[in-house]
UniProtKB/Swiss-Prot annotation:
Protein name: Glutamate--tRNA ligase
InterPro entries associated with the record: aa-tRNA-synth_I_cd-bd (IPR045462), aa-tRNA-synth_I_codon-bd_sub2 (IPR020751), aa-tRNA-synth_I_CS (IPR001412), aa_tRNA-synth_I_cd-bd_sf (IPR008925), Glu-tRNA-ligase_bac/mito (IPR004527), Glu/Gln-tRNA-synth (IPR000924), Glu/Gln-tRNA-synth_Ib_cat-dom (IPR020058), GluQ/Sye (IPR049940)
Pfam (any one): tRNA-synt_1c
UniProt-annotated binding residues for ATP: 256
GO biological process, one term: glutamyl-tRNA aminoacylation
GO molecular function, one term: zinc ion binding
Species for this entry: Clostridium acetobutylicum (strain ATCC 824 / DSM 792 / JCM 1419 / IAM 19013 / LMG 5710 / NBRC 13948 / NRRL B-527 / VKM B-1787 / 2291 / W)
Span(s) of short sequence motif 'KMSKS' region: 253-257
Quaternary assembly: Monomer.
Top enzyme category: ligase
Length: 485
């Protein structure tokens, strides 16, 4: 590790799910490192074995790969300070915890579950947060050794002072002081020999040379305890960047427990990965200037973590949809068509329909790809529709006028020999000109008959071109039949 090198880490738990908040943490962590040409490290925090989900690692790797957040060190690529999976480092945490015991900064706790349950019940009755009562901190060395020799199960707890205060600095929230009387003696090593998340991440951050720690502000309350661990070991404290939460609305946080979308959910709904990443970057950070459409390279160049907002960010699906639309329009026609193909699948089954023409027609109108099936299904099959759709105040049409228009227009369409967009358009526009009526009087009924829908991508000419001459004539005749009833 080079001296003065910026080193950040993304340290997810393998729970099989990449929450939007987790992805933002990964992104900000990546941007802090890359803005300074530093190293971005992936570490897997799997100390909570009960929450471990099979194949969860694959979700993490796939998400980072898809979003372009390439890690410099990690379980799959190695590096100078591995292993990068906490369960593979299990042995070293106990050694560090024992060092704290020797210094009087931690102690063995042999309390039974029953005793702890009584303490918790008493705390609840007094409406106070649970705080361990330091019962085992008062055991003599001999008593401790006797219990260890007898194989009594134990945990190792941090030994926090009960007087004075602990102060720490955070980039976003500034200097924060906490009364030591509020600090619980948190568990460092669990009875199964595994370290707790709180202990392992401090040890690992030090051993891996992490200079900046990015995490959610729900960890602010734990920061004083982390600081005391750094000080107890005589280690440098990293720069803390506690990010505000991402809210679903004014009252509730975005949460996987409430079924809120994960990154993968958004991709499956038809959002582009670049748009999602761009949108997530702006949930708490605003670059200078008005441009909100930013590539990952732009973000690396512009990102300044000292400008992250303190107030919570609200996840706005409407804004995300708009931003996705901006990215969709930036695609080349070939790129758009390739992405759209799976959404045509099973919706458009007729072989004579040119899907590329549909792609060309809808690209500027699509915001998310999952909108496509409902937008294009009428090309394949004319839906049943109400004749009231022929009434349009602005176009000055109603069922009677529409019936006349379709009847008069049908032979004109039947006589078009070379069926292509230009020919269809020129023939019908010349017919309207000769008729001396407003365009809408003919085109509104025609588009309605051809599509059976109130809103369509493209107008009558484009629809007729795509569905073909025979199908166009068939649909116009259905329209006439409906209007004659």
């Amino acid at each position: 590790m080079a001296a003065n090198e910026i080193r950040t880490r993304f340290a997810p738990s393998p729970t099989g799910y990449m929450h939007i908040g987790n992805l933002r943490t990964a992104l900000y962590t990546y941007l802090i490192a890359k803005h300074e040409d530093g190293k971005f490290i992936l570490r897997i925090e799997d100390t909570d074995q009960e929450r471990y989900v099979e194949d969860a690692l694959a979700v993490i790797y796939k998400t980072l790969e898809m979003t372009g957040l390439k890690h410099d060190e990690g379980p799959d690529v190695g590096g100078p300070v591995g292993p990068y999976v906490q369960s593979e480092r299990k042995g070293l945490y106990l050694d560090y915890a024992k060092k704290l015991v020797e210094k009087g900064e931690a102690y063995y706790c042999f309390c039974s579950k029953e005793r702890l349950d009584i303490l918790k019940t008493n705390s609840e009755a007094l409406k106070r947060p649970f705080k361990y009562d330091k019962h085992c901190a008062n055991l003599s060395k001999e008593e401790v050794q006797e219990k260890l020799d007898a194989g009594v199960p134990y945990v190792i707890r941090q030994n926090n002072p009960t007087t004075g205060s602990t102060t720490f600095d955070d980039v976003i929230y500034g200097r924060i002081s906490v009364d030591n009387s509020e600090l619980d003696d948190m568990i460092l090593i669990k009875s199964d020999g595994y370290p707790t998340y709180n202990f392992a991440n401090v040890v690992d951050d030090h051993l891996m040379g992490i200079t900046h720690v990015v995490r959610g502000n729900e960890y602010l309350s734990s920061a004083p305890k982390y600081n005391r661990l750094y000080e107890a070991f005589g280690w440098n404290v990293p720069i803390y960047v506690h990010c505000p939460p991402i809210m679903k609305d004014a009252h509730s946080k975005l949460s996987k427990r409430n079924g809120d979308a994960s990154f993968q959910d958004l991709i499956e709904k038809g959002y582009l990965k670049e748009a999602v990443l761009n949108y997530i970057a702006l949930l708490g950070w605003n670059p200078e200037g008005t441009n909100e459409i930013l590539s990952l390279e732009d973000m690396v160049k512009l990102f300044d973590y000292t400008h992250i907002n303190k107030s919570p960010a609200v996840f706005d699906p409407v804004k995300l949809k708009w931003m996705n639309g901006e990215y969709v329009r930036k695609l080349s026609l070939d790129e758009f068509h390739k992405a759209a193909l799976s959404y045509y699948d099973g919706v458009i089954t007729k072989e004579n329909i040119d899907l590329k023409k549909i792609s060309e027609l809808i690209q500027t109108r699509v915001e998310i790809f999952s909108d496509i099936p409902e937008m294009v299904d009428f090309f394949n099959e004319l839906p049943d529709y109400d004749i009231e759709m022929y009434t349009h105040k602005k176009m000055k049409t109603n069922p009677e006028i529409s019936l006349d228009s379709l009847k008069n227009c049908l032979p004109v369409i039947e006589n078009i020999e070379d069926w292509n967009l230009d020919n269809i358009q020129n023939t019908i526009m010349n017919y309207i000109k000769d008729l001396g009526v407003k365009n809408g009087v003919v085109l509104w009924p025609l588009r309605t008959a051809l599509s059976g829908k109130k809103f369509t991508p493209g107008g009558a000419f484009e629809i007729a071109d795509i569905i073909g001459k025979d199908e166009s004539i068939r649909r116009i005749k259905i329209g006439i039949e409906k209007l004659e009833k």
